[in-house]
């Protein structure tokens, strides 16, 4: 190793001689490091004393209040003058993500929403209470009025009707279906007589008076209004209701002789003026015309289907 160093030093001249002198003064610490500093625990050949002797960078301070003062005047009054001459740093203002006005508006909006919800809830409660009070008043006035059986279809009538097709009429149709022309004339006259009947006046919300006041402002005494109970005294029993219903919609039947003939039962459904006669088939519940009713019984296309339909005046088992 010494021969190789002398050989390299001969090419370097004085530099080589100085290097050789330095190597002799350093001793064994300047040996060539062959580990390349690739160990996991650190560099084995690093000289810690040499690393500490290297000049280090002065760390700059990030705090504004700490500042380096020029070292020129030593101590005493000169140092005090420099300290007083340095301006004090301005305090940093903390920024806010939301301004105060926006926060107040948000709270105000929440209060308005809560008030609106309370108002809507109060209205719902008032509406529900008014409906309950109206029902209780109707129940306390006399219970279920018997007049409702005549004005509106009862459960008995709904159960007897096979399907809810077609339109009902407030007037009574013909009593039976004998001949086509006579049946239509009878139903037309009955409808006209029912339409000419005046409707009962309804009670006004104010109380006693139901009509409009005269021009001079004096109120005339009105006759007592007829109640639903007085109008429906004739239909107080279930037997009368069944009888009137059977008169409104009598039972009919059609019998056709032949291999395909059979007997079909049905009932004549209510119909209005200038409307076609409808018969409800009991077996299927379909609304059929007289021709379709006869054809349903197996009679085929006939010229006058009303002649093949028989009205049953006796009480039917379906009612």
UniProtKB/Swiss-Prot annotation:
GO BP terms in the entry: negative regulation of DNA-templated transcription; signal transduction
Homology family: Belongs to the Ninja family.
Comp. bias intervals (Gly residues): 70-79
Record InterPro entries: Ninja_fam, Ninja_motif, NLS_NINJA_AFP-like, TDBD
Biased composition (Basic and acidic residues): 105-118
Biased composition (Low complexity): 225-234
Pfam family, one: EAR
Keywords associated with the record: Nucleus
Region (Disordered): 1-26, 69-152, 181-234
Protein name: Ninja-family protein Os07g0602900
